[in-house]
Amino acid sequence: MGIRKYKPTTPGRRGSSVADFVEITRSEPEKSLVRPLSKTGGRNSSGRITTRHIGGGHKRAYRLIDFRRHDKDGVPAKVAHIEYDPNRTARIALLHYVDGEKRYIIAPAKLKQGDRIENGPEADIKPGNNLPLRNIPVGTVIHAIEIRPGGGAKIARSAGASVQLVAREGRFAQLRMPSGEIRNVDVRCRATIGEVGNAEQSNINWGKAGRMRWKGKRPTVRGVAMNPIDHPHGGGEGKTSGGRHPVSPWGQPEGRTRRPGKESDKLIVRRRRTGKKR
C-alpha cells in the first residue's frame, strides 16, 4: 500500500491524502459473504446515547470474516482476491478452499492474489497460515490471536497490528502485545502468521471534517467549551481551564481505563507502560 497526496487545489484538499489501493484486486464483495448492516447512531434499544461521536456516514454492507479457522484444518485454499472492507482498517482476502467453500480472512502484509493458504498444526510458517500457538516458533510475528481456545481471533486485527511470541512455558505462551504488555495465552489458542497489512493507514491525513463524517464519525467537543449542565469542565466567564483535574462528562477521572482486580489480570506477566503512577 502507498499513500497518494493531493495538491492544495482547495482548503479541504490541502495536506490531505488517500490510500492508493494498488493491492485491491476486486471492487465488489462476494455476495454470499455479505450481510446488511444498520446504523445505530451510537444509541441503544432505548434510544439513549451509549457511544458518543457516532452517527451518519456512508451506507455499508458487513463482510463475514472467518475468525475461527479450525474447521478447515488440512484443507488448503487459494487467495482469490484482496478486497477493501469499509468496516475495518485492514484489507480482507477472499479464500477459495479446495472443497469449494469461500471465506474472508484479515489480509496480512505481503499476502497477494494466487498465494496458497493452510490451516492446522502441520501448516508452514508463512504469512496467512493459521496454527495453534504450540506449533509456532518462538520469535515469530503473529496476528488475529484467540484469547480462549476456539473463541475466535480477538487480538491484533487492525491495520499494521502485530504481536510477537516471545516465550513458551508449560501450557502458556507469552505474547508481547502492541501496547508493550507481555501476557500469557493458552498454547491451544490459534494465531495467524505475519502482521496485518495496510500498515500505512495511520499516516493518512483526512484533510477535512467532511471525510470523517463520511466515515460516520461526529465531532468531539471539549468539555471546557460546554455549558456547566453538559460537562463538569463547562461554564465560567471567558476561556477557562476547567478548574479541576480532567474528568469525563460523568465525573470519572481521566486515565485508568483498566478494571483493577479483573480475573484475567493474573495472566499479565509485564504490564504496559502508561506513564502514570500506580
UniProtKB/Swiss-Prot annotation:
Pfam families: Ribosomal_L2, Ribosomal_L2_C. PROSITE patterns: RIBOSOMAL_L2 (PS00467). Signal peptide: none annotated. One of its GO terms (cellular component) is large ribosomal subunit. The keyword Cytoplasm does not apply. Residues 255-268 have a biased composition (Basic and acidic residues). It comes from the Bacteria. GO terms for biological process: cytoplasmic translation. Residues 269-278 have a biased composition (Basic residues). Residues 29-53, 223-278 are annotated as: Disordered. InterPro entries: NA-bd_OB-fold, Rib_uL2_dom2, Ribosomal_uL2, Ribosomal_uL2_bac/org-type, Ribosomal_uL2_C, Ribosomal_uL2_CS, Ribosomal_uL2_dom3, Ribosomal_uL2_RNA-bd_dom. GO terms for molecular function: rRNA binding; structural constituent of ribosome; transferase activity. PANTHER family: LARGE RIBOSOMAL SUBUNIT PROTEIN UL2M, RIBOSOMAL PROTEIN L2. Part of the 50S ribosomal subunit. Forms a bridge to the 30S subunit in the 70S ribosome. One of the primary rRNA binding proteins. Required for association of the 30S and 50S subunits to form the 70S ribosome, for tRNA binding and peptide bond formation. It has been suggested to have peptidyltransferase activity; this is somewhat controversial. Makes several contacts with the 16S rRNA in the 70S ribosome. This is Large ribosomal subunit protein uL2. It comes from Kineococcus radiotolerans (strain ATCC BAA-149 / DSM 14245 / SRS30216).
